[in-house]
Amino acid sequence: MANPLRSEVRQLYKNLLFLGREYPKGADYFGERLKRAFMKNKDVTDPKEIKKLVDRGEFVIKELEALYYLRKYRAMKKRYYEEELSTMLNIG
């Protein structure tokens, strides 16, 4: 693996590992799957193929961020609408 690509791959791994802390199934589950995915591709030496894999990893980062934002939005929306609904119905 070429030096610039090596640093990209390491940074991608670190970013994914950091994002995995909030994964719904748990950080351990995410970390194991992440390690397995990286180990599966450890023998890839073609720079073009490595770049494709890095791009795919960056796509996964964007998808995880979208998942987390959506989850936080839903939780916040649920809190506000539960309060509003309970005050309208005088439940509590």
Curated annotation (Swiss-Prot):
InterPro entries documented for this protein: Complex1_LYR_dom, Complex1_LYR_ETFRF1_LYRM5, ETFRF1
Gene Ontology, cellular component aspect: mitochondrion
Keywords: Mitochondrion
Matching Pfam families: Complex1_LYR
Coiled-coil region: none
Single Gene Ontology BP annotation: negative regulation of oxidative phosphorylation
Organism superkingdom: Eukaryota
Main localization (coarse): mitochondrion
Subcellular location: Mitochondrion
PANTHER family from the UniProt entry: ELECTRON TRANSFER FLAVOPROTEIN REGULATORY FACTOR 1 (PTHR21024:SF0), GROWTH HORMONE-INDUCIBLE SOLUBLE PROTEIN-RELATED (PTHR21024)
Family classification: Belongs to the complex I LYR family.
Described purpose of this protein according to its UniProt entry: Acts as a regulator of the electron transfer flavoprotein by promoting the removal of flavin from the ETF holoenzyme (composed of etfa and etfb).
Identification of the protein by name: Electron transfer flavoprotein regulatory factor 1
The species this protein was found in: Salmo salar (Atlantic salmon)
